[in-house]
Amino acid sequence: MRMTGPVERVLTAFLSDPAAPRYGYDLMKAARLPSGTLYPLLARLEQQKLVGSAWETPQQEGERPRKYYRLTGEGVRIARLELAQASARRQRAPARPGRPAPGSLG
Amino acid sequence: MRGERRLLRLGECLVRQACRRLPQEIREEHYREWAAELPAILHDPQVRPAPWRAVRMLVYAADTLRGTALTPGWVRGPRSRLSVAGDLLFWVAALVLVAFNSWSVAQAPGDWQEYLLPAWSVLFVAYLIRKRVHPVGRMTALLYTGSTLTLVAWNAAQGNWLNYVFAALVFIPLPILLLAWWLRVAMPARGRHALRDSG
């Protein structure tokens, strides 16, 4: 799995409560991703067996069943590992020299 | 919300359009999944005011069109003869424009307008290349068509007879191509009724 920004955001959203079922729209809001990015990403995670999906039973008559997603056991393990590695990589990376503040030296 | 059913229908229409591009075996499930989120977006109490929810829902539905091209299993369907002919026509027009505009620059290197036109025609070729690499480009095509028409009309207004020829080349086939595109998008197509029934 290649750790891109969107993947990182989706995994972070899942890990905020790994046991909770997450709908597409719910994940869109949590990860701040548009549907055109989120759904292909979920499909790839599902192909890799990191995410499982199921259809909910509608609570009320006339309501449409929605599909929800959840990290698999393996998905939780890999997501935690990948996010930790990504965080470590960011800490190791040298900080970019920023623009000096007005009035400061350098 | 007023007009809620119409909005939902429009959203469903966009999602259906997106799903038509998916393989048959995953099409129905994706349509059910994506269309089921539309009422949830439209009734989301966290998003206010109501018109903003409607915009979000339509953006969600429209973006699934982009998403289908990135979904695993997506395959470009067989292309119609009209589509192939349209592409060929655009390629010929683009290459002729590049050649003619480059020739014009060579003839009158001092005129700034002559530099603008080759740059624009190279953009035309770049668009066609992009379209080959990435198939999601209908909106870009419409935007580009609009700018093409504007530019051609502006050129024709300058009074150069050659520009009238180019104007005719663009004005005559474009409405036909746009009508064909609209017919393909808006009219019932294979698999659409199955999706409607299942949704």
Short names for language-model regions:
Chain A
Residues 77-106:
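Amphipathic alpha-helical dimerization/coiled-coil segments
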Residues 42-46:
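Short, hydrophobic-biased segments on the C-terminal half of alpha helices
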Residues 1-37:
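N-terminal helix-turn-helix DNA-binding core of bacterial DNA-binding proteins
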Residues 60-83:
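Basic, amphipathic "hinge/linker" alpha-helix immediately C-terminal to the N-terminal HTH DNA-binding motif
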Residues 48-62:
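Beta-hairpin "wing" of winged helix-turn-helix
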Residues 55-57, 73, 97:
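Short alpha-helix boundary/capping motifs
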